[in-house]
Amino acid sequence: MFRVSCIQLRSNNNIHNNLDKTSKLIIKAIKQKTDFIITPEVSSHFSLNKKELLKICTSMQNDIYLNGIKKLAKKYKKWILIGSLIIKISKNKLVNRSVLIDRSGKIRTYYDKIHMYDVVLSKKEKYFESKS
């Protein structure tokens, strides 16, 4: 039987904290004999403030979260799909990128989300992906 684990966490703007939480959940899934692990969208960090994101986001090569997950994939010989993480592709441009990592810790492929959406959930909770 092929087992898939979907990790669920509530990311915030602390990439180190999110990596720690994700790593613990991945190891827990591995102990339950999973074969393939999937993390949620914006696993690495979450913020509605684009200026803040531009300060903390980096390229794929320098992304602390991505590099940490690659090490786990290699160490435990598991394929991991990062639902998405925010990657800086230029001084003022971010992308919401899904990344597939193989069991040797190498990136096999990635996909940049292109279907942005805007939603107003309440007076206080509003998301405007189209402005990122």
Q: Model-found features: residue ranges?
A:
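Catalytic metal-binding/acid-base residues of hydrolase active sites
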Residues: 10, 43, 85-86
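A short acidic, glycine-rich active-site loop
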Residues: 55-67, 126-127
